[in-house]
Amino acid sequence: MSQTQDYECRSHNVDLPESRIPGSNTRLEWVEIIEPRTRERMYANLVTGECVWDPPAGVRIKRTSENQWWELFDPNTSRFYYYNASTQRTVWHRPQGCDIIPLAKLQTLKQNTESPRASAESSPGRGSSVSREGSTSSSLEPEPDTEKAQELPARAGRPAAFGTVKEDSGSSSPPGVFLEKDYEIYRDYSADGQLLHYRTSSLRWNSGAKERMLIKVADREPSFLAAQGNGYAPDGPPGVRSRRPSGSQHSPSLQTFAPEADGTIFFPERRPSPFLKRAELPGSSSPLLAQPRKPSGDSQPSSPRYGYEPPLYEEPPVEYQAPIYDEPPMDVQFEAGGGYQAGSPQRSPGRKPRPFLQPNKQGPPSPCQQLVLTKQKCPERFLSLEYSPAGKEYVRQLVYVEQAGSSPKLRAGPRHKYAPNPGGGSYSLQPSPCLLRDQRLGVKSGDYSTMEGPELRHSQPPTPLPQAQEDAMSWSSQQDTLSSTGYSPGTRKRKSRKPSLCQATSATPTEGPGDLLVEQPLAEEQPPCGTSLAPVKRAEGEAEGARGAAEPFLAQARLAWEAQQAHFHMKQRSSWDSQQDGSGYESDGALPLPMPGPVVRAFSEDEALAQQENRHWRRGTFEKLGFPQILLEKSVSVQTNLASPEPYLHPSQSEDLAACAQFESSRQSRSGVPSSSCVFPTFTLRKPSSETDIENWASKHFNKHTQGLFRRKVSIANMLAWSSESIKKPMIVTSDRHVKKEACELFKLIQMYMGDRRAKADPLHVALEVATKGWSVQGLRDELYIQLCRQTTENFRLESLARGWELMAICLAFFPPTPKFHSYLEGYIYRHMDPVNDTKGVAISTYAKYCYHKLQKAALTGAKKGLKKPNVEEIRHAKNAVFSPSMFGSALQEVMGMQRERYPERQLPWVQTRLSEEVLALNGDQTEGIFRVPGDIDEVNALKLQVDQWKVPTGLEDPHVPASLLKLWYRELEEPLIPHEFYEQCIAHYDSPEAAVAVVHALPRINRMVLCYLIRFLQVFVQPANVAVTKMDVSNLAMVMAPNCLRCQSDDPRVIFENTRKEMSFLRVLIQHLDTSFMEGVL
């Protein structure tokens, strides 16, 4: 599956009118649109109606600007309205003198092809004419077997100005409808007008972090929670199954009701949801019909993409606040060996709520009926749960359940846990006290291996299973769906239990994103286990009513689980290395951590299809998905590299060569393609996989920032966007008081350099202070780089944006980030290397390429050496080096190109000949330990600065300084002096003078000339008279110079050790036998 196929929304075969830029005759086919809150870019073709996430190649794209307005259409008033994504203004009248992007054409396209079934499914509380608050539209992609209208991708989290709730079509404010979903979309609205959910049919939600749904935790649940995992239409014959063409593009966990052969369509019977049902007020049979909607003025902007913003709705009272779960809230287990699942809610055609557990009037109550959730005696415990910093920040604002304080059903009851029962199908209800665990600790007893909300499953001791059956039958073990061990950030590495055969097969009538594929063979779905479907149905009928009592807990746990599942699932999809059929995804497919409050990710069919595409992934996959610490901190063995996407497995400087080799060998065996990711034995960079690398890292390491009188929490998205305000505490959590103080001052200095704050000192001195702070205090480095990433994100002041990238380039010239943040900074820089990101007057791609190069180099060399702090000259040189490349670290051809204007007649690099002459001029051939004793590092740095300006100071006294700089120049060449393609020949002929000389003459001309000049230079030092003084014979010289001419590409320490000896021998043979007389007088 190609990336374009996966990310674009295909349109119906309807021609759209041609669009042109106002005031221009240029035909406008592709335009860039930026969602106002999440700042996600998408590209729409106004001719074909195609929408893609990645910029199309080879076409002109109209960049977004403050002068861009979106033309939308309100079907209720039959009027066009206009929305400015930059200023977030919505007006009725057509703006003048600006670019109008006619997005309403896509609306018209949808309306012309909309299925009549959408109206058939409408019911009270689902008014199709009611606009959505927060504009919660998401991108939809039609299934391959259907012909649906194309929709413009949009995100959740629109500002209130972009969408407000309307009661009647005569509203005086512009509508909130951006683009409605096409082809059978069912919307639920709560009594106060909030969108509850969408139910979609024969459609896929588009992948990645670019689609969201706002789901009010109130009354009903989306169809992806109500889908029947066994593939049978409820109340229908068991032989009737919903059909879809098989293939990797179909979701293995979401049931789609596609048209049958006779044209009929099955819809699931809809029952009240135990997860998304709001506690009802006394005497109110339906919260949908009980209360009027809130006026539009009460609407608030929805939460941004990665946010920890406060919820859109008021937080419930403390005494009724449901706990934040990191495990399922209860497990109702029953006897009789049935495979009962409490988590398969459905909807009846009339959508009338049914009680979850109605008393059995004709028989004794079932064990499920005895479930009573009593009021928690220690409600304050729920608020004092100990979490790791990552887990607390992640879970704290994850889900809020709207509760009515007077509801008799609203009980804060004890939590229940699974109780393994070795007696086969016997179940029992075991309440347990509040489990106050630190998320950083592994779960011992009561560990929930499958985060399935209230679903009831066997908890028998695990039995051996074929891995394929494990993957197919377990919620958490299904290859890419979710490992509940990562349900909360602090507990991702806890060990999950493997389900037994009976346990897995009894879970077939489940619902939600972890369900089994409906197309799977029955033999795979239901291997012999001793249970039958009949007990399941009976138990289902007996236990329907515990849902009402446990609603608040179940809703919170279920929504948290859904969000976490989507997060882990999309993190797997973000792997840019192609899997099996080459359907890997590139850098815009990952999903960030869950949103706060009632904002919940929609688990889409498109997201679920990756489960089927990557069957070979195992249960342990998501236990290691959190950070690149897998290798950077050596927290686990490199043998687990298959359990994590490639970009999270960067070999670090502290990693041994054997681990790197093992990692690379397994990677090659997986992809079948050799990789150069471990060319250097210490560290190398790999293409980043996720747009949300920094956001994911930030969600676990950022401080909580608040704003305003009511101390509203600042979302991660806003914390990573440009700000003209100062910060009151560091962005990254730290316990170092000095770092806390310096971080706030550092942010002000960055603003001063970028021109966002008035400064008394000149910019160079401000940059010097910034670089000095980062160079001196290692704890400030990540803070500095995350602040620079923030100030260069969504910065529309071009001069400020250029200065921000310039300051990042300056800092990278002196010190790298810490290994923990290294890969995330790499991902941020990499995404800006495409020239499409360049704006008028700001060559962002040039800055990004330079920064990427410096970051790669800094990973190998570390921070600036020496005791002297950076000075103004070094700052000026680092600033100019962005557009005036240095002679150090460049290729030989580039060095020759730099000197072409100054020294057009030279055949050799000026820096090589000038430094060599300086060594001899300072009697280096009569200095003991020449080329072995290093020069003073501060003097070497100063000389390097001068040489890069085509100057050599006359006051040098120590020959070790130019000798050390000369070795540095050879060593830092972009490609080694003897290219890689000749390396094996050199190693093979290390003891043959004739063959070694032949290799030299086979080199490219510039390489041959430079190498011969070096050999002739070294031959001066091997003269017996000089060796007697320098103590550097031919073997010693070969030893110190060979690493500067040859580079071993192997990661095996044994190969490196053996080749080092051969490299020295090869260079010694050249010094002794290569005739360099033809280099006499050549410069």
UniProtKB/Swiss-Prot annotation:
A GO cellular component annotation in the UniProt record: cytosol
SUPFAM superfamilies cross-referenced by the UniProt entry: GTPase activation domain, GAP, WW domain
Domain Rho-GAP residues, every copy: 890-1078
Biased composition (Basic and acidic residues): 268-280
Localization annotation: Nucleus
Annotated WW domain residues: 25-58, 63-97
Record key words, sorted: Acetylation, GTPase activation, Nucleus, Phosphoprotein, Repeat
Residues the record marks as site: Arginine finger: R932
Biased composition (Low complexity): 117-141
InterPro entries in the cross-refs: MyTH4_dom, MyTH4_dom_sf, Rho_GTPase_activation_prot, RhoGAP_dom, WW_dom, WW_dom_sf
N-acetylserine PTM positions: S2
Domain MyTH4 residues, every copy: 722-879
GO molecular function: GTPase activator activity
Modified positions (Phosphoserine) in chain numbering: S169, S286, S384, S388, S406, S407, S604, S690, S715, S726
GO biological process: postsynapse organization; regulation of small GTPase mediated signal transduction; signal transduction
Domain of life, per lineage: Eukaryota
Polar residues: bias regions: 245-256, 474-488, 573-582
PANTHER family: FI04035P, RHO GTPASE-ACTIVATING PROTEIN 39
Annotated protein name in UniProt: Rho GTPase-activating protein 39
Organism from which the protein derives: Homo sapiens
Classification of source organism: Eukaryota, Metazoa, Chordata, Craniata, Vertebrata
